[in-house]
Amino acid sequence: PNDFGELIGQDTLVKTFYNSLNKGRLAHAFLLTGIRGVGKTTTARIIAKALNCIGDGTNTEPIFDICNICSTCISINKGNFLDVIEVDAASRTGVDGIREIIDAVMYSPNSGRYKVYIIDEVHMLSTSAVSSLLKNLEEPPEHVKFIFCTTEPRKIPATILSRCQRFDLKRIPFSTLAKFLQNIASKEGKEINVNA
């Protein structure tokens, strides 16, 4: 998926994010939970695009209908947009592993509207790493958004959980996936057998 319209099976997240965006009440930190492969990191990238998409150049606020053709969206899709920083907490568990984040949070975005930190497997961070990150969650700069992804929310300290808007991503039922694939095939002029 490249935008909220393609994010099937996650209707609660899509509707809540849409409403938050329209009311100008976006959280400064999001927690995406769910089983492996459910789309947490992909969803985080979609949120990052919504926060930074410039569309035809006139967008000055985050938008729900991501264009996927502006330079910002293209860079985020390619993984080389400087203001969307992805961190694998499983391989950087200690304070030193996230010091780069802690030190860089105070600086304004390079070209985006927001600096977005996507921290995958956040439950793997050590207690000291969480403590050092906490100050940024308690008093976040206006230009920073955090998106935490995890398969094990119960391992995340309450001090982090209480500062995030939480979305539990659901496993997509086979019937929903089959219908989605049939729609794609139909648009491409192809026919598929979902029972195969």
List PLM regions with ranges:
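P-loop/Walker A NTP-binding region and its immediately flanking N-terminal helices
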Residues: P1-R166, I172-S186, V194
